[in-house]
Amino acid sequence: MSRRVILTLVLVTILVKTMAGMESKKVETTDEIKKRSGTSEKERESGRLLGVVKRLIVCFRSPFPGRRAISEQT
């Protein structure tokens, strides 16, 4: 693999881990605390990572949410 691809993968991994860490520090509601009490730490961490990855995919698919894609405009 080229160095550029490896560097890109490393940077995306760091970004995902950072965003997951930031999400874990948000204030929890009582419903989230009740839901969390039945799950293990590993399950919660994987859920956070999946949530971050889903948001990144949405961001890359539509970087400007107010604008439609060029293919939709024609």
Swiss-Prot record:
Highest taxon in the source lineage: Eukaryota
Compartment(s) where it occurs, according to its Swiss-Prot or TrEMBL record: Secreted; Target cell membrane
Signal peptide: 1-21
Keyword Secreted carried by entry: yes
Modification Proline amide occurs at: P65
Keyword terms, alphabetized: Amidation, Antibiotic, Antimicrobial, Cleavage on pair of basic residues, Cytolysis, Fungicide, Membrane, Secreted, Signal, Target cell membrane, Target membrane
GO cellular component: extracellular region; membrane; other organism cell membrane
Expression tissues: Expressed by the venom gland.
GO BP terms: defense response to bacterium; defense response to fungus; killing of cells of another organism
Removed propeptide positions: 22-33, 69-74
Function in brief: Possesses antimicrobial activity against both Gram-negative (MIC=23.8-51.2 uM) and Gram-positive (MIC=11.8-46.5 uM) bacteria, as well as against the fungus C.tropicalis (MIC=48.6 uM). Also possesses a relatively high hemolytic activity. May act by disrupting the integrity of the bacterial cell membrane.
Family: Belongs to the non-disulfide-bridged peptide (NDBP) superfamily. Medium-length antimicrobial peptide (group 3) family.
Protein name according to UniProt: Antimicrobial peptide HsAp1
Organism: Heterometrus spinifer (Asia giant forest scorpion)
